[in-house]
Amino acid sequence: MKKNYLITTGGSGGHVIPATILYDHLEKKANVIISTDKRGLKYLNKDIFTLEIINTPKLNNILFLPLTFLSILFLTFRSILLLKRKKIKKLISTGGYMSLPLIFAAKIFSLYIYLIEPNQVLGRANKFFLNSCKYIFCYS
């Protein structure tokens, strides 16, 4: 039986393109789903990839911060349902704020979390979850 993997990505091509390459590699031996936000959709073909949309709001507007935290809480609950429904065993994140709800949900289920850092400097989301991950993959 194939394992179920979820790759969470979104935002810019710098996050999404590595996720698509990993998807192509893993789909030969596992069931793979990509979760992205609306911005990441422009880099993904719905006919090629199995997709789930988790549209996490940006964390950059201090006036809407309480609403943003409520939204992330709601999306974490939605992510819990997704992980359970799809029987996900491992979560791979390319970082970014859009990965927050899914990684929180994966922590609740004690799933293996793998982080990919596509930049030379560790991003804030990956730094936040560094102690929760099984491995972090970086470019050299």
Where do the protein language model's features map onto the residues?
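An amphipathic, basic-hydrophobic alpha-helix
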Residues: 61-90, 100, 108
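Short, glycine-rich nucleotide/cofactor-binding loops
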Residues: 7-15, 91
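Histidine-centered beta-alpha loop that forms part of the nucleotide-sugar donor binding/catalytic region
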Residues: 10, 96, 117-120
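Well-ordered beta-strand positions
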Residues: 50, 90, 134-135
